[in-house]
Amino acid sequence: MIDLKKSQMWLDRVAYDMDTAKAMLQTGRLIYAVFMCQQSLEKCFKGLLAYQDKEIIPIHNLRRLAELSNVIQKLDEPMLMKLDFLSNYYINARYKEDLQQLSKGITEAVAQDFIQFSEGLITWLCQKMK
């Protein structure tokens, strides 16, 4: 049976995390903007899994979550590459020694692109829950 409360709980967190991603972009904390995009998408996929009445397993890989929620076949290769890129920022972004290495390729434009990508995918995923 579909548990709309559980699904909505995840989606409420998505909005908060996307707002945080935008705030991090504005303050120049670009790696954290990207990290929050990963968090937003992870929670959105888990919200979709809850909506589909599927088990929510404790994983953070966005491609795997797309598979589990049966939407991966609708995502093109560039989208999957972005999911893979964002998945790298889950735990690594939290460890100081990795921050410098991970930050190298993150410019303001890159962070903005991931925010736009995440917002678009979140909108699309949310439409699957109507």
Can you annotate each of these PLM segments?
Residues 1-130:
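Terminal alpha-helical segments
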